[in-house]
UniProtKB/Swiss-Prot annotation:
GO terms for molecular function: glycine hydroxymethyltransferase activity; pyridoxal phosphate binding. Gene3D superfamilies: Aspartate Aminotransferase, domain 1 (3.90.1150.10), Type I PLP-dependent aspartate aminotransferase-like (Major domain) (3.40.640.10). This is Serine hydroxymethyltransferase. GO terms for biological process: glycine biosynthetic process from serine; tetrahydrofolate interconversion. It catalyses: (6R)-5,10-methylene-5,6,7,8-tetrahydrofolate + glycine + H2O = (6S)-5,6,7,8-tetrahydrofolate + L-serine. Pfam families: SHMT (PF00464). GO terms for cellular component: cytosol. Transmembrane segments: none annotated. It comes from the Bacteria. Homodimer. It comes from Klebsiella pneumoniae (strain 342). Keywords: Amino-acid biosynthesis, Cytoplasm, One-carbon metabolism, Pyridoxal phosphate, Transferase. Catalyzes the reversible interconversion of serine and glycine with tetrahydrofolate (THF) serving as the one-carbon carrier. This reaction serves as the major source of one-carbon groups required for the biosynthesis of purines, thymidylate, methionine, and other important biomolecules. Also exhibits THF-independent aldolase activity toward beta-hydroxyamino acids, producing glycine and aldehydes, via a retro-aldol mechanism.
Length: 417
């Protein structure tokens, strides 16, 4: 018999210590990785529920196992909320991750060897949009598009590449692009050659849900997203579509199960349902508006301190600092800021002379600090501290002084009060 009072601390001290240390790290470090965020206790409650015990291969009302009457309710809630939130008429909430969701879309719509037009990873794209080290780059003939000299997506080049190579699919979406994407223009280019438009909106899903960033769902044939990042839910994936055929939706469902996955993670799907409900609340819109304001406020400080920001600004939650002119590598900047309890990630910049393991830039995002309650005043102060560290990257006294300020502001703005 399993006793409810069982706990990790009394059973596995070594593991518990690591978990507790991570909890402290999250409270005492400022998180600026653009893809990270903090889930609500409600989301974590769902993930730690008894739903983790239930196998439920199939879809609501069409399961391969008995005893699914309640998990059917859970999954249908998640499906209905996803459709309502993003204005879709199809949703699949089962993908275990954004990459799994993307894989399912490729499986449903393409054959190995088909030509695909995707954003260059070095200019803001994502691994699953055609990187040669990823399944997408191994299975398909990838033609990259990129950005122009101003740092904006080059739609003329995209249209030219589309006409020349006649891809079966064009991918919209990014992991390190700070501008507004013209989804309608992308659909126009796709329609001109009879291609699918597939949008991966993982990074901006929360902003889109709140009406702060344009929604691709009315324009794309298929859309995927993660449920964490700006959406602030559990780690997982989601597929959406609007105006498609039942045949398309059946292909997408089959590409998730049974093609790519077996049993869905019902505890995670419950957590997705919670997060989607939270994203419908008025305070979520206020939060996302502040995310965008905070990113702009940080950019202003970096520019005033003489740092180069790729594309000159941001229209979403993230931006890239180009450190080439400062003779700094992303790896060095990442490490120095980390010693000051400020977490970022090194990131390649356009025409980067360094390898992806070193890079010449860092990516900065505002979702997590905004979740803590930071507003413009706090993020401007934070950006100034970051400049102090980068200006004095080998001065441990400066780094320690900034670390003290970070610990103080983290205590004033706890993640979980």
């Amino acid at each position: 018999m399993l006793k409810r009072e069982m706990n990790i601390a009394d059973y596995d001290a070594e593991l518990w210590q690591a978990m507790e240390q991570e909890k402290v790290r999250q409270e005492e470090h400022i998180e600026l990785i653009a893809s990270e965020n903090y889930t609500s206790p409600r989301v974590m409650q769902a993930q730690g529920s008894q739903l983790t015990n239930k196998y439920a291969e199939g879809y609501p009302g069409k399961r391969y196992y008995g005893g699914c009457e309640y998990v059917d309710v859970v999954e249908q809630l998640a499906i209905d909320r996803a459709k309502e939130l993003f204005g879709a008429d199809y949703a699949n909430v089962q993908p275990h991750s954004g990459s799994q969701a993307n894989f399912a879309v490729y499986t449903a719509l393409l054959q190995p060897g088909d030509t695909v037009l995707g954003m260059n990873l070095a200019q803001g794209g994502h691994l699953t949009h055609g990187s040669p080290v990823n399944f997408s780059g191994k299975l398909y003939n990838i033609i990259p598009y990129g950005i122009d000299e101003s740092g904006k997506i080059d739609y003329d080049d995209m249209a030219k590449q589309a006409q020349e190579h006649k891809p079966k699919m064009i991918i919209g979406g990014f992991s390190a692009y700070s501008g507004i994407v013209d989804w309608a223009k992308m659909r126009e280019i796709a329609d001109s050659i009879g291609a699918y438009l597939f949008v991966d909106m993982a990074h901006v899903a929360g902003l889109i849900a709140a009406g702060v960033y344009p929604n691709p769902v009315p324009h794309a044939h298929v859309v995927t997203t993660t449920t964490h990042k700006t959406l602030a839910g559990p780690r997982g994936g989601l597929i959406l579509a609007k105006g498609g055929s039942e045949e398309l939706y059946k292909k997408l469902n089959s590409a998730v199960f049974p093609s790519a996955q077996g049993g869905p993670l019902m505890h995670v799907i419950a957590a997705k349902a919670v997060a989607l409900k939270e994203a419908m609340e008025p305070e979520f819109k206020v939060y996302q508006q502040q995310v965008a304001k905070n990113a702009k406020a940080m950019v202003e400080v970096f520019l005033n301190r003489g740092y180069k920001v790729v594309s000159g600004g941001t229209e979403n939650h993230l931006f890239l600092l180009d450190l080439v002119d400062k003779n700094l590598t992303g790896k060095e900047a990442d490490a120095a800021l980390g010693r000051a309890n400020i977490t970022v990630n090194k990131n390649s910049v356009p025409n980067d002379p360094k390898s992806p393991f070193v890079t010449s830039g860092i990516r900065i995002g505002s979702p997590a600090v905004t979740r803590r309650g930071f507003k413009e005043a706090e993020v401007k102060e934070l950006a100034g501290w970051m400049c102090d560290v980068l200006d004095n990257i080998n001065d441990e006294a400066v780094i320690e002084r900034v670390k003290g300020k970070v610990l103080d502001i983290c205590a004033r703005f706890p993640v979980y009060a």
